[in-house]
């Protein structure tokens, strides 16, 4: 949208509309809205709809295009985005569309639209996207509406590309990283901030690659915090974990709680796996930097691990999970390997007997080291981990779930055992209410693990009330006495109340790190 005038024409920009949908919107409603926006075509007039196609919307977009073409056969459909930029000819969505731009579309999409409208007509269906110098790309931020700024997390980019070659990632295909000129970019951020934007998510693959630029961006937001209207500022960056120079640490340490969030891809601590997938990561430095961030900064850490990588076993993944958990980040995202189109991870398919779903999101279903049942078992555990650990609803109770039941056990296996039991009792990973989860945790800790009922109930009570839920789990059905502004059981023992108060105080002091 932002480049339709610069690389097309002023007239083209004026004739272009940007329409966004959610996956929840019925497809017939999307068709009606799109065709209504275009209006009835005049004789000889070309009408164009472009779609950004991703792993998460390709199925719905394929069906949407089929409906559009059935209702208006002369419509020109142009595709772009990562899902159609690789293995292009094999895809149904490509076969039913008119043109595909692979790679960058900032310049190529306006040029293609101008050709379709004014001629000469393009000869090729698949068009390799032109990658211009970044100073030839118009930044899009002026097109953000006031509604966007007031209600949305804003995606911004200070750079594109990535110099690293992790084989599961599409960015591994980039030759390097390219940075936008910093002064104009910061001016755009200032304008957005003055218009009321407070939630910024940087989509740069490696924010802390160029430290001088990182420092200036962090300083920009730090300066905003001195202004009277800085309430609600939240800034999210994706960082590599083993590159945190003192210059960067000094600024990070100045941020107050609730402002800075880092997404930190660990993926695996297994050095053999790291080499197989061309991932360069200093594990010792990674751990040291994570520990520094937790102890010396107020940054919220969202860390990632990937299950199913070639060469990874269940036991080796468990070791990596326990190592990361012991460091204490606020979140650990447990992902499943996906074979994204075009990624070099495909080169391991035969040697490691990798079997993937043939439908999006193309998750791995079996490897030489992980059978199908183990993959299913872990997938369930990952969903329960989100519901219990990453949700923040069980801050006091989670350490009990993670505490090894024996010296031969570990936190990973403790939670896996809970996940196995929860699956056996419910046979579902979706639709579990907060109350059902509270009762499941209570039963596991008191019946399976044999922990003291009153101590477990006190923890769950505090967790449940703090979560803001207002129903009544069975294990807390009688809790009615006042406790710190809330209510507990009138028949609760003094020991229960004292334990709950003590645990709440401990929670306030130590925050919500996953390892308690």
Model segments located where?
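Glycine-rich, histidine-containing beta strand-loop boundary motifs that form or position
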Residues: 20, 53, 81, 103-104, ...
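A structural motif corresponding to the C-terminal lobe/cap of the Radical SAM core domain
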Residues: 211, 224-231, 238-243, 247-409
